[in-house]
């Protein structure tokens, strides 16, 4: 990274980052290979039919690639006559795929260096786990959402036009050859609708190069959110700043006017920003789903909805369905986010008060942010994974019946502990207990199937040692103290706990 930083500093002195020459450096592909090992494997291996060995990283392939890249029209020829690469076997576009993986590493370099430099300026580099923890969102929800009135459940629209993606990156990367290469990849992966595929709670990416398309998608989402951040910042000091300054800071408002749909114009800019002024507005996003919450009125939320739809249509040139944005009251609505079913119910209560000889009742209303394990979708997810049927009845997992007993118990126990760890912040544990029961009994049925025995006989033979494999470390400590606990400790056991070491959504939860 130090070598890359020195190279880019030289390029920056000429007012440009020249990223394209980095494609001719061998260690770039080594970085892509190392990243591939940590994710889903990599293509930088010598094929077995060529090397005579099992899959191993081959610098020879990289050297061949770099040599051929110096040839004129190499990329064009590799697409038009992809069968000429006979030594790569069934993968016709092997070389272009190698280049795309290397290119994915290169385009991230300026953003990584910019992040490091900004943290160094603050003289404080926070722990990466704290920056990446997705569960840090929920303490924020607990503090803020109970005081708000309305919530918008937003699905960010897809797919975006390929030219728009290139235009987005032009703001960050001025290296023209790199942008041309990006257009080449778009031409190769022509079926863009299959590159980013929608799911209920997450987006899937192209199997050919998920890192590149994840980077492109994140760039697109940042562009979508930039207008929201801009309006939020400007509305906070609207009265002290002239409207002319706003138009000098951004260009996309002019594009909107050219589309003959005047959402923001020079004369009414201050007035329109004033309409969106809301000091109690909060926005949170994970992958393709975002939450916009406000203390304002329903009319204000409808204006935000209309503005988002118009912005997507004019700036990204595609139709966005208004039904992708739902507006609801917190007291009457539950929303799915990061595998939790969350809501803010109103809990009425009566307090008896007495003054001298007179006593009377005072009606009070409290609101508390609730996080619940969605049991019906979770049972559906467990059913797809063959741990139970669609009704939630545990079944055996035959594909694991050939493993050792210790491996079977370890696999089931690890899944159960991970789910307990992920859903530790649930305010109601009954659904979590049912999920753990399904996994424990599915494990027992799998072992009984392997040994051709009954579940009852197998459970009696293993005893409590079998159940301990499904406890988390925290539950083991508390279970030892349960016979002698006081009430506060028992209450602590039922409280929500958010862990800052959870950096991605659980695989079973991801199906929700």
UniProtKB/Swiss-Prot annotation:
InterPro entries registered for this protein in UniProt: Domain_X, Maturase_MatK, Maturase_MatK_N
Compartmental location: Plastid, Chloroplast
Record key words, sorted: Chloroplast, mRNA processing, Plastid, RNA-binding, tRNA processing
Keyword RNA-binding in record: yes
MF GO annotations: RNA binding
Signal peptide segment: none
Domain of life, per lineage: Eukaryota
Pfam family, one: MatK_N
GO biological process terms on file: mRNA processing; RNA splicing; tRNA processing
Keyword Protein biosynthesis: no
Annotated GO CC locations: chloroplast
Function: Usually encoded in the trnK tRNA gene intron. Probably assists in splicing its own and other chloroplast group II introns.
Family affiliation: Belongs to the intron maturase 2 family. MatK subfamily.
Protein name, per record: Maturase K
Lineage: Eukaryota, Viridiplantae, Streptophyta, Embryophyta, Tracheophyta
């Amino acid at each position: 990274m130090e070598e890359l930083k020195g190279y880019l500093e030289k390029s920056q002195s000429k007012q440009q980052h020249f990223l394209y020459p980095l494609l001719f450096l061998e260690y770039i592909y080594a970085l892509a290979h190392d990243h591939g090992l940590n994710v889903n494997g990599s293509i930088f291996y010598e094929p077995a039919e060529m090397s005579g060995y099992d899959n191993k990283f081959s610098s020879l392939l990289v050297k061949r690639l770099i040599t051929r890249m110096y040839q004129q029209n190499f990329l064009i020829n590799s697409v038009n006559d992809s069968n000429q690469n006979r030594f790569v076997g069934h993968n016709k576009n092997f070389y272009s795929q190698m280049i795309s993986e290397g290119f994915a590493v290169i385009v991230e370099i300026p953003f990584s260096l910019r992040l490091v430099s900004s943290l160094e300026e603050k003289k404080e580099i926070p722990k990466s786990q704290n920056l990446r923890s997705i569960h840090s969102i929920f303490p924020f929800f607990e503090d803020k959402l109970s005081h708000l009135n309305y919530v918008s459940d937003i699905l960010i629209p897809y797919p975006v036009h390929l030219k728009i993606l290139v235009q987005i990156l032009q703001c960050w990367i001025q290296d023209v050859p790199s942008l041309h290469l990006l257009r080449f990849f778009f031409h190769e992966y022509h079926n863009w609708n299959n590159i980013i595929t929608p799911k209920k709670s997450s987006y899937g990416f192209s199997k050919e190069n998920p890192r590149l398309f994840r980077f492109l998608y994140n760039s697109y989402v940042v562009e979508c959110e930039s207008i929201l951040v801009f309006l939020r910042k400007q509305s906070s000091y609207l009265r002290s700043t002239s409207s002319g300054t706003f138009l000098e800071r951004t260009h996309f408002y002019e594009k909107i006017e050219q589309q003959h749909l005047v959402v923001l114009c020079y004369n009414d800019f201050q007035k329109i920003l004033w309409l969106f002024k809301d000091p109690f507005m909060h926005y949170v996003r994970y992958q393709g789903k975002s939450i916009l919450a406000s203390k304002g009125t329903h009319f204000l939320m409808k204006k935000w909805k209309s503005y988002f739809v118009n912005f997507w249509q004019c700036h990204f040139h595609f139709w966005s369905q208004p039904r992708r944005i739902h507006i609801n009251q917190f007291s009457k609505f539950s929303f799915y986010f990061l595998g939790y079913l969350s809501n803010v119910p109103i809990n009425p209560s009566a307090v008896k008060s007495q003054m001298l000889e007179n006593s009377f009742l005072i009606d009070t209303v409290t609101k508390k942010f609730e996080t619940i394990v969605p049991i019906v979708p979770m049972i559906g997810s467990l059913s797809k994974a063959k741990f139970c049927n669609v009704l939630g009845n545990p079944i055996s997992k035959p594909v694991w019946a050939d493993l050792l007993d210790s491996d079977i118990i370890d696999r089931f126990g690890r899944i159960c502990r991970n789910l307990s760890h992920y859903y530790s912040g649930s305010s109601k544990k009954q659904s979590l207990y049912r999920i753990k029961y399904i996994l424990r009994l599915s494990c027992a049925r799998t072992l009984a199937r392997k040994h051709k025995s009954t579940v009852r006989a197998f459970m009696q033979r293993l005893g409590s040692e079998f159940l301990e494999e499904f406890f988390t470390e925290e539950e083991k400590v508390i279970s030892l103290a349960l016979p002698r606990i006081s009430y506060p400790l028992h209450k602590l056991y039922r409280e929500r706990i958010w862990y800052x070491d959870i950096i991605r959504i659980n695989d079973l939860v991801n199906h929700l």
